[in-house]
Structures are given as C-alpha cells and as structure tokens.
C-alpha cells in the first residue's frame, strides 16, 4: 500500500531507487550458481564471474587465486555500491543508509577486542575487519582493558556511543563479557533502527518492521542456543533479547528458560512463520538452522522489491549482496579444498 510518500518520493529518492533496482538485477541467479558449482578450480570461478558485475573487480588478479582474494574483491563491489548511494542520498535516506553500517561497526569492535585478548597482531586484525564498519580510531581499541575504557578512549566519538549505556561496567574484558557486549550493542542498535524506521512511516516502516523483527527473533534464538550450558543466567539471557519482534514478549519468556535445542524448537513451533524453519531439522539438530534462517531472510528481502517508494530496498539489496558473498566464499572454499560433495550444503539461492 502506498501513502502520501508516493507523491514526493521520486524528488529525492527516485534516482537512487532506480540505481538499487539495477544493482539487484545484477545479483547471481540459480543458473549462475549451478555453473559455479561445476568449477574445478578458483580460476574457473573467476572466469564464470567475469561475465557478472564482479568481472571488473577480478579481471586483473593473477593466478593462483585464493578464496580470500575473491571474497575481498566481491566485498569491494558491495562497498563501492554503498558509497555511491550514500554520496547521492539526502536526509532522511542518508541516515537510513548510515544505520546499515552500524552492524558491521559492532562486529569490527568485537573482532579487534577479541583478537587483542588472544594476543593477535592489531594490523592483522584490522585487515580482517569489514570495510563498511571501519572508523578512524579503530586501531586504538587494542588498549582498552574494560568496557568503560573502551567507551571513554575510543567509542565516545563514534555512532555506537549511544548503544554503550547498557554495557558500561568495570569488569575486565574476557570472552564471555565480549559476547555479552556484542549482543547488548546489537540489541540497542536494532531497537534504535526500528524506532527510526517507525518515524519514517509509510511502506518503509511497514517493510522494515518485518525485516528487523525477523532479525531480532533470529538473534534471540541464536543467543538462547549459544548460551545453553554456559554460566549465563535466565535473567541475563532475557536482557539480551530485543524488545520487539514476533517473539516479544511471551516467546522471550519461554526461550529464557530453555535448556536444550528441542525445548527451543518447541517454543518456535508455536509461531507459524517459524514453524517451517524448524520443521526442516531433525530433533536435537541445530547445524542446518543457520541456513534455514538465511533462506527465510532471503525470501523476505526479495519481497521488499515488490513495492515501490520506500527505503527498505536499500537494506534488502545490501543484505542480499552480503548473502551472495557468503555463497561465493563457501563455493570457493569447497572447490579449493576439493570438497565438492558439500558445495550445496550452505548455498542459499535467491532467484
């Protein structure tokens, strides 16, 4: 359904919406994936990708290729598309596009802090960071000993600063506290993004509410499964769940007390949209859960393109391109390690 935004959307957003729909048309199809799965080596993959949007990014790469090179160059395509859209955008679209970066910024902070804890080289860690999540003071994250220092020395001048209000403790950074920090930051980020989209109203609010609610629910399930058998209490677990989504609040109450994967399954099967996801798994199995969630996410992201005059297409395109890069990384790894029998295990088809 279109509201009054359809009358004026094209003044500032029409050009960029046309651009992003053009980018979407360049995503790999099932036929492309079938061809890639037949490749015998990474040079074959490069040859198949030469006819796609990635061609110009890979054409000057010498043999022998490595999986990391393919992923790096494909990610560069994503970053270039994003930067082009951002520099053309006006408010409030530019703020919406900035929100898309924040998840990568959180991941980069966690990567640097965790790596430093395990005495990894800072420069090596920075090279592994996602380019969309980079910020000026990222290298100085290594000096922080606890959450307060992390905030005071580094993050106070970044867009993540407001999300740190829940994690400002003097406890030393260890693996458990870093994971709690990651999930607390993500909770604050998702809730903030959700509120921003609600303020925008119209089709943007409607479609983004569905996409962000799905993300919040998926994170709630993953937090529950990953915290089974750890020292995280039920109350601590519940604090990490986002305060919106299909599971909020009653599903959260039930997830907080789950003690194994089958109990999680029992909770999720009460919610029809998630029933199909869990029906694909055997009892006691969680290995295929990530793929099932990714497939459902891709289905919802593709539906975002069925309507016009809204910002959700930008979010959907970025997520679909990220999924495509995950697919290419998996295919490349399977080919490089001669594990072609497993090549279809993690590929999520889009079109």
Swiss-Prot record:
It comes from Arabidopsis thaliana (Mouse-ear cress). InterPro entries: ATPase_csu/dsu_sf, ATPase_V0-cplx_csu/dsu, ATPase_V0-cplx_dsu, V-type_ATPase_csu/dsu, V-type_ATPase_csu/dsu_dom_3. Subunit of the integral membrane V0 complex of vacuolar ATPase. Vacuolar ATPase is responsible for acidifying a variety of intracellular compartments in eukaryotic cells, thus providing most of the energy required for transport processes in the vacuolar system. V-ATPase is a heteromultimeric enzyme composed of a peripheral catalytic V1 complex (components A to H) attached to an integral membrane V0 proton pore complex (components: a, c, c'', d and e). It is a peripheral membrane protein. GO terms for molecular function: proton-transporting ATPase activity, rotational mechanism. The lineage of its organism: Eukaryota, Viridiplantae, Streptophyta, Embryophyta, Tracheophyta. GO terms for cellular component: cytosol; Golgi apparatus; plant-type vacuole; plasma membrane; plasmodesma; proton-transporting V-type ATPase, V0 domain; vacuolar membrane; vacuole. Its main location: membrane. Keywords: Hydrogen ion transport, Ion transport, Membrane, Transport, Vacuole. The gene is VHA-d1. This is V-type proton ATPase subunit d1.
């Amino acid at each position: 359904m279109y509201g009054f935004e359809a009358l004026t959307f094209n003044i500032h957003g029409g050009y960029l919406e046309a651009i992003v729909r053009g980018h979407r048309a360049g995503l790999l199809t099932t036929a492309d994936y079938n061809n890639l799965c037949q490749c015998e080596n990474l040079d074959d993959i490069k040859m198949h990708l030469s006819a796609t949007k990635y061609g110009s990014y890979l054409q000057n790469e010498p043999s022998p290729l490595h999986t990391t090179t393919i992923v790096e160059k494909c990610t560069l395509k994503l970053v270039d598309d994003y930067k082009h859209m951002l520099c053309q955008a006006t408010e409030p679209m530019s703020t919406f596009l900035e929100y898309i970066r924040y998840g990568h910024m959180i991941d980069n902070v966690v990567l640097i802090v965790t790596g430093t804890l395990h005495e990894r080289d800072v420069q090596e860690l920075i090279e592994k960071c996602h380019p969309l999540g980079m910020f000026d003071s990222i290298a100085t994250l290594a000096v922080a000993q606890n959450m307060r220092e992390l905030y005071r020395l580094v993050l106070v001048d970044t867009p993540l600063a407001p999300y740190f209000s829940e994690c400002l403790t003097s406890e030393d950074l260890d693996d458990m506290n870093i994971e709690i920090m990651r999930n607390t930051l993500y909770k604050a980020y998702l809730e903030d993004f959700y509120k921003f989209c609600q303020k925008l109203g119209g089709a943007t609010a409607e479609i983004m509410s569905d996409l962000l609610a799905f993300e919040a629910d998926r994170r709630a399930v993953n937090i529950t499964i990953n915290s089974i058998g750890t020292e995280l209490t039920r109350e601590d677990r519940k604090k990490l769940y986002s305060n919106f989504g299909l599971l909020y609040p009653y599903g959260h109450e039930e997830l907080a007390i789950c003690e194994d994967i089958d109990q999680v399954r029992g909770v999720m099967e009460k919610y029809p949209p998630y029933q199909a996801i869990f029906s694909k798994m055997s009892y006691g199995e969680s290995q295929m859960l990530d793929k099932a969630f990714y497939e459902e996410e891709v289905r919802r992201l593709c539906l975002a393109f069925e309507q016009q005059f809204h910002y959700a297409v930008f979010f959907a395109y970025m997520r679909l391109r990220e999924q495509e890069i995950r697919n290419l990384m998996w295919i490349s790894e399977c080919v490089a390690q001669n594990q072609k029998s497993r090549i279809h295990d993690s590929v999520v088809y889009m079109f």
